[in-house]
Amino acid sequence: MMKKKISAKKKNQQQQQLHQPTMSEVTEEERTRYEEEEDVRDSPSDSSEESEDDEEEIQKVREGFIVDDEEDEVQTKKRKSHKRKRDKERPHYDDALDDDDLELLLENSGLKRGSSSSGKFKRLKRKQIEDDEDEIESQDHQGEQQLRDIFSDDEEVEEEAAPRIMDEFDGFIEEDDFSDEDEQTRLERREQRKKKKQGPRIDTSNLSNVDRQSLSELFEVFGDGNEYDWALEAQELEDAGAIDKEEPASLDEVFEHSELKERMLTEEDNLIRIIDVPERYQMYRSALTYIDLDDEELELEKTWVANTLLKEKKAFLRDDWVEPFKQCVGQVVQFVSKENLEVPFIWNHRRDYLEYVDPDAPIPGSVRELMISEDDVWRIVKLDIEYHSLYEKRLNTEKIIDSLEIDDELVKDIKTLDSMVAIQDMHDYIQFTYSKEIRQREETQNRKHSKFALYERIRENVLYDAVKAYGITAKEFGENVQDQSSKGFEVPYRIHATDDPWESPDDMIERLIQDDEVIFRDEKTARDAVRRTFADEIFYNPKIRHEVRSTYKLYASISVAVTEKGRASIDAHSPFADIKYAINRSPADLIAKPDVLLRMLEAERLGLVVIKVETKDFANWFDCLFNCLKSDGFSDISEKWNQERQAVLRTAISRLCAVVALNTKEDLRRECERLIASKVRHGLLAKIEQAPFTPYGFDIGSKANVLALTFGKGDYDSAVVGVYIKHDGKVSRFFKSTENPSRNRETEDAFKGQLKQFFDEDETPDVVVVSGYNANTKRLHDVVYNFVSEYGISVKSEFDDGSSQLVKVIWGQDETARLYQNSERAKKEFPDKPTLVKYAISLGRYLQDPLLEYITLGDDILSLTFHEHQKLISNDLVKEVVESAFVDLVNAVGVDINESVRDSRLAQTLKYVGGLGPRKASGMLRNIAQKLGSVLTTRSQLIEYELTTRTIFINCSAALKISLNKSINVKDFEIEILDTTRIHPEDYQLAMKMAADALDMDEESELHEKGGVIKELLENDPSKLNLLNLNDFANQIYKLTHKLKFRSLQAIRLELIQGFAEIRSPFRILTNEDAFFILTGEKPQMLKNTVIPATITKVTKNHHDPYARIRGLKVVTPSLIQGTIDENAIPRDAEYVQGQVVQAVVLELYTDTFAAVLSLRREDISRAMKGGVVREYGKWDYKAEDEDIKREKAKENAKLAKTRNIQHPFYRNFNYKQAEEYLAPQNVGDYVIRPSSKGASYLTITWKVGNNLFQHLLVEERSRGRFKEYIVDGKTYEDLDQLAFQHIQVIAKNVTDMVRHPKFREGTLSVVHEWLESYTRANPKSSAYVFCYDHKSPGNFLLLFKVNVSAKVVTWHVKTEVGGYELRSSVYPNMLSLCNGFKQAVKMSSQQTKSYNTGYY
C-alpha cells in the first residue's frame, strides 16, 4: 500500500477521532459543539509542523458536503494522456476546495485519500462549451457550488427543491469525456456538426445518468437508427457544448411513454435517481407529500409509532421493558424519518440503539436485551408512512379550521387525534357543521353544490325549532356520552340535563307547518326532516363516533351467515367448511388465525356467506347511550318526547354502526393481511437464508463444483441429462445418456458405465444433485446414489492430507429451475440448449447460491408459494415482503461491486443494497463502467467520483465489497483493506484504533499514521483483538461523543478477524419429506387419511379358481406414488381388474420409498370423506347447522314421500346427485336402486360407468298376478338381482373391455379430437380412429376417425348393449368384431361414394 504524508494537524485530528463523529451523523446541536472543539483541535500540538488552516474554509467543507476520497497526487502516464485540458477554460475560484481541505474532509468521514490521484480536486462533470466566455465562467462557478450543495446536510425549503434537483442532476451524473484535440480542431468540428444537423433536436441532457443502452434499444424499436440520426446528432452536439438556444424536444415527445416507463427513462425515474433519498423510501412515499416534521411533531410521531407497535408486541414484552422499548422505537423513527437510513443500515450499524442495557447490571453494559427485531424495523418504516399520511390529513383539516376561523371546542383538540378515522370524523364534522361557510368560501371557485344543502335550509328555517325542542344538543349529548363512558355508564348523574318542551312532538310539528316560511307543509315530511336533521347532528358528532368506534374495538363480534348458494356449495371438503357456521369471533380470535377472516372475506366475495360485524350486548349498550339523551320527566309529553329521542338515536346509531362495522372489517382485513404477509416473508427467508453448499474440506461460504442430473418426467424413453457447473458458476460440461436406468437392469448398468466415463474425464464434482418432474425421479436418485457407493467416487480435501469423502448425492430444490427453464432469461443465456438442460443448469446454480437464484427470477417469483395462505393476499403485498427479505439478506451477505459490473446475474442483487433500487443501482453500475473503467478500487470513489450522494453512500457503502479481478492491473491504485470487510467507512478510524491497541502501537507511530496498522494486524495475529475490552472502549466513546458503539465494535472485531465471512446458515440438504413434496406435490401430513383415485396395476389372486378371493392389489396414484392394498382392506366378494380406477383412502405413507398403504373398505372411505372441522362451542352456530340439515332432509323427504321402500340391499332413498356421490368412490359396475321421479311404478338404477360418469336406467315395474317383472331397454327380467347380473354387469363388462382397448382415449371430446388431428398430422399417410366416452350419454361411446390427413374428423355413435356393441344398426359381440365391422363399414361407405360420384359425372 502506498504511503502518504499526513500533516501534523491531521495527526492531531486522528488523536481526537473519538471526539468527532462522521459527517454522516452530525446534527445541528452536535455541530455547534464540534465547532467549539475545533479551536482546541486546531491549536498547535507537539506533533504539529504546519500552520493553521483557514477555519472558514473548513466550516464550509463540513457544512457543504461529505467526501470519502480524493484523487491521488500522482497520475499515471496513461491517465495523464486522457486528462481533460481545461485549465485555460476556467479560472480557479477562491472558494474552491483546496487539497488540505479535501483531505481533512476525507479523514473526518472515516475514509482515506487515494495516493495515485492528483493533489488538486478534479471535477468529473463535462462542461458545456459556449461561444460566450463569460457564460462559461458563470456556469463553471455554479457547477462548483452545486458540487458542494449536493452533499449538504441542510434541507432547503420545498419551493427550492425542484430547480436544485435539476441542477444537482446536471452536475452529478453527467458523463465525462477526455480529449487531446486542441481548441482550433474542436471549433472546426463543432461547426461541421452544426451544418450537418437536421430535423428537430431531442433534449438528452437529462440522460447522462440514464441507460444509454436502453435509449439505443428504443431507437431500434422505432427504426433502424437512420430515422433518428438527428436525435443522436443532438446528443453529440450537446456533449460538445454546441446545442443552440432552441426549445429541445423531450423523450416523451419522441417515444411512447410506456416504452420509457418500461426502461425507467421517464422524468420521474430520473428524479428518483438523483434525489438523495433511498429509492425504496421514495417509492413508499410516492403517494405522499412527506413533509419534513419539526421537532415537536417528530416527538408525536415517535409516541404514535411506539404505541402502535407496543399494541402488536405487548404479549412479548415484560412490563419493565415498555419504556426502553418506546425509546428504541423513537430512535428508529429518527433514523428513518429524519436521516433516511434504510433498514439494513439501521440493523447492521445502529444495533446499539435497538437494545436495552440494564443499568443495574454488576458490570455496566454486560446485560443487554434486544428490544426491536429486524422485522420491527421494517414495520416502523411502514408506520412512518402511515403517520405521515395521518399528519397530512390532519394538516389539511387544520388549514380548513384556520381559514374558517372556527371557534369550536370540538376542534381544538385536533392535534391529539392519533388515528386516520378520528381525523376523518373531525373532517366530516367540520364539513357538516360549517357547510354553509365552506360553500360560501368555495363559491369563488364555482363549487356551489353541497351535499348538506337540506341541512342548511332546515337550520335556517322555522322547522329547526323542533330540533331545538329535543331539549339537548348533539354536542351536549356527546359530552354526556364521553363522561358516562369514561365511568363505565355507572354514575346516575349527567353533565347536561335534557329539558322537555310544553307541547307534544305532534302538536309542535302541526304548529310549525302553519308558518308561512316553513319549507315542508306536509306533517309527515316535516317530522321526518326534523328527525333526520337531529340524527345527522348526532351522526357527525366526533365524540359519539369515538364512543361507537371504541365499543366496536373492544366488543366487536364477527359472525357468518351462509347464503343459499353457500349452503349448497360448501361441503366438508370446501376450503370454507370451517367457517360455514362461524359466529361470535372476536378481533383477537381472528388476529390469532388471520387466514380465517381472509377466507371469510373471500367467501363473501364469492357470494357464499355474509359477514356480520356487531357489538356484544347491543341492547344494553344502546340503553346506556339513551340514558344520556332522554329526559327524566314522567308526564305524557315527556314520554312522547323520549320516544321521539329514542327513534332519532336508533337511526343515528344504526347508521354509525354500519359505518364502523365496515371500518372494523377493513381494519381487521389489513391487519390479517399484514400477518399473512409476515409469514410469507419468513417462508422466503427460510429458503434464502442458507449459504451455498459447502464442499468437503472447505469453509462455509465456499462454492462447490456441481453435477446436476435429471431425466424430466422419467418415462422409459426419457434420456438422462446432466450439467457440470464449476465453482465460479461457469457451465463447463454436459452429460447425456439415452440408457434410462429405470427401464431395466441392462440399461441401468449401461448408464452407470457412461456416468463413470464422464467422471473419469475431468475433475470429480463435489456434489451430485438430482431432481425431476415427478416421483419417477426417485429411481434415478437411487441409481446414482448406489453408483457413487459402488465405484467409491470420492472428493479430496482442499488440504493435501490424504483425507477424502464420498461425493454426496442429494435431492435438489427445483422450484426455481421449473420457472427458469422456460423463461426469456434462459433463452437468452442458452439459446441452443433444450429445456431440460436449462432446468438442470438452474438446479445446479441453486446449490451455489440459493439467494441469487431466487433473486434472478424477477417477478416470476410471485408464482411460487412460501405460505399456504399466500393466495389470500395481493401480489403487490407479496412483492413488497419478498423485496424486504431480499434486502435483508443481500445487505447481510454483501455484494461484490466489481463482479456485479462484469456479471449481469450478480448485478441483479445490487438493487437490494441499502439506499439503492433498480434505478440507482443501474446508474451506479453504468457510472463505474464509464468513469472508472469498470473497476471501483475503493468505496471512497463513490463520493469522489460523484457516483452516489451523501445519504445513499451512508446506506450502501458497507454492503459493497471491493475485490479486484486478478487480471486487472492495480499497481496504480491504493487499496483500502477495510473496503474488503463489512465495516462501515464511518467506523474506519475505530477499526484502526482497535488494531493499534491490539498491537500495542502508539498512535503517533508512522505505521498507524499511514493506515498500515490494519495490514500489520492481519499479517500478525488478528486474534489479538479478542483481548480488547470492548465494553470499556464503548463507554469511552460514549463519554466523548455520546454515541453508542458497543455492537459496532463487536462487528468490527469480527470483520477484522474473519473478513466478510459467510453469516448465513449452512446449506439445508433436503429430507425425504421435502423430496416427496417436490416430486409429488403432496404434503405427507395432509395426504394421509384422504380419499384419492388409484389405478390398479396388479391383481394378486388364484386366477385358476373362479371363486378365489383377491389377496392383494398393486396401485399407482396420479402423483405416481406406488401403493399396496392388503386383503383385509378389500371388500369381500369384490372383483377388480388391472387398469381399473378405484377410490381408495391412504392409511400409511412412506416418504423414503414413495410408497403408500391404502384401503378400499367403505367404512374407511366414509370416515375419510367426513372431514375434520373443529366446532368450538359458542363460536359455531349449531342451531343454524341443524336447521339446514333438517331443511335438506325435508326437501328430500318431500320428493320421496310417494315412493315405496323396496326390500333390496342396494336400494337407497337417493336422488340422482346423492347416488352419484355415493357411487363416486365405488368401482365401475357398482350400482344403487333408487326411487324414480316418474312415479310409483318406476325405479331408477344408477350405475358407475367411469370416473364422474354414471348411467341412470329407467326400470318399469309390472305385476303379473303374484309375480313381478322388471323391464329395461325392452328386455324383461324376473327380479332385480337378475336384472343387475344379466343386464348391468354384462354392460359394465363391455364398458370395461372398451376402456381397456388400445384404441380408447380418455378425456373430453375436444381433447380426443385434438389428439386425432395431431396424430394424423404426424402420420399423414395413415388413417386413424379412436374410441372415447360419450359424456352426453354415459354408458355409450363415440368413434372418431379420419381417413387421411386432409379429411375431416367423422364421429359415429357406439351403443353398449347386453349383446355387445351397436354401430350403425349392426351389433358386434366384442371389440375385435366391432373394429373389423367398423373398417368394413368405412370401406363400403367409401365405395358407395365413388359410385355415386361416377354416376353423377
From Swiss-Prot:
Protein's gene: SPT6
Full protein name: Transcription elongation factor SPT6
Any matching Pfam family: YqgF
Sorted alphabetically, the Gene Ontology cellular component annotations on this record are: euchromatin; pericentric heterochromatin; transcription elongation factor complex
**Source species of the chain:** Candida albicans (strain SC5314 / ATCC MYA-2876) (Yeast)
Disulfide linkages recorded for this protein, renumbered to the chain, are none
Which compartment or compartments is the protein found in?
Answer: Nucleus; Chromosome
Segments carrying the region annotation (Disordered) are 1-209
The record's similarity note reads: Belongs to the SPT6 family.
**Basic residues bias: where?**
1-12, 77-87
Protein's UniProt keywords contain Transcription: yes
